[in-house]
């Protein structure tokens, strides 16, 4: 591992924007190197103290749904090259699982999540801040495909959630956080030019840190 602190790349954007595709493209390029992915989705607040009817009301697209205090604590530990135990969220029980995932520190940390740029404390820990900007129509189609196929949701429930929760939260919190990004990537994982530029930039930063 390097003698300097790791490089932190923040990748934000709305649900279905292609964040995961961009993250995977960057991760795959540096595969075999010292790199890890830390997803904000794993850091939803523990709700085990609440009855199920209350948990079902959780707005997963609101900043208050996330335990950013724990995420920041873990990120700071990884920056100090210390192992952390990443929590696991159980979407069927709508609370944190008892399972944990040990995460070893690496020289490159990709922090991914819909609202990572909304919290200035997280922004301060990032070396590069990206926002994946994708048309709303494409985002809802991707979300429908994912939720129906992978999570067993009905089309009506996905549309209802999008209209009443996802879209207003995107407009209120996610879209405004775009102004804090260093780079805005349109078209998500399909934008190979932007991804290649990012890979080159990250490689340059890593080289500079090694030579310090």
Swiss-Prot record:
ATP binds at residues 13-20. Its main location: cytoplasm. Pfam families: PRK. It catalyses: uridine + ATP = UMP + ADP + H(+); cytidine + ATP = CMP + ADP + H(+). NCBIfam families: PRK05480.1 (NF004018), udk (TIGR00235). This is Uridine kinase. GO terms for molecular function: ATP binding; cytidine kinase activity; uridine kinase activity. GO terms for cellular component: cytoplasm. Gene3D superfamilies: P-loop containing nucleotide triphosphate hydrolases (3.40.50.300). It is found in: Cytoplasm. The keyword Transferase applies. Pathway: Pyrimidine metabolism; CTP biosynthesis via salvage pathway; CTP from cytidine: step 1/3; Pyrimidine metabolism; UMP biosynthesis via salvage pathway; UMP from uridine: step 1/1. Its EC number is 2.7.1.48. Signal peptide: none annotated. Belongs to the uridine kinase family. HAMAP family: Uridine_kinase. InterPro entries: P-loop_NTPase, PRK/URK, Uridine_kinase, Uridine_kinase-like. Keywords: ATP-binding, Cytoplasm, Kinase, Nucleotide-binding, Transferase. One of its GO terms (biological process) is UMP salvage.
């Amino acid at each position: 591992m390097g003698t300097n602190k790791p490089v932190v790349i923040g990748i934000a954007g709305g649900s279905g924007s292609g964040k995961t595709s961009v993250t995977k493209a960057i991760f795959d390029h540096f595969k075999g190197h010292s790199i890890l992915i830390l997803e904000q989705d794993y850091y939803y607040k523990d709700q085990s103290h609440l009855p199920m009817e209350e948990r079902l009301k959780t707005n997963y697209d609101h900043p208050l749904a996330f335990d950013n205090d724990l995420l920041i604590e873990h990120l700071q530990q990884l920056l100090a090259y210390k192992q952390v135990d990443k929590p696991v969220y159980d979407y069927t029980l709508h609370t944190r699982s008892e399972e944990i995932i040990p995460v070893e520190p690496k020289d490159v940390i990709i922090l991914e999540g819909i609202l990572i740029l909304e919290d200035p404390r997280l922004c301060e820990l990032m070396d590069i801040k990206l926002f994946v900007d994708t048309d709303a129509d494409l985002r809802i189609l991707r979300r429908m495909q994912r939720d129906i196929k992978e999570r067993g949701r009905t089309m009506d429930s996905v549309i209802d959630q999008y209209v009443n929760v996802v879209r207003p939260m995107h407009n209120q919190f996610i879209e405004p956080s775009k102004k804090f990004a260093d780079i805005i990537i349109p078209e998500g994982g399909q934008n190979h030019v932007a991804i290649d530029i990012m890979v080159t930039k990250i490689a340059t930063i890593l080289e500079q840190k090694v030579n310090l």
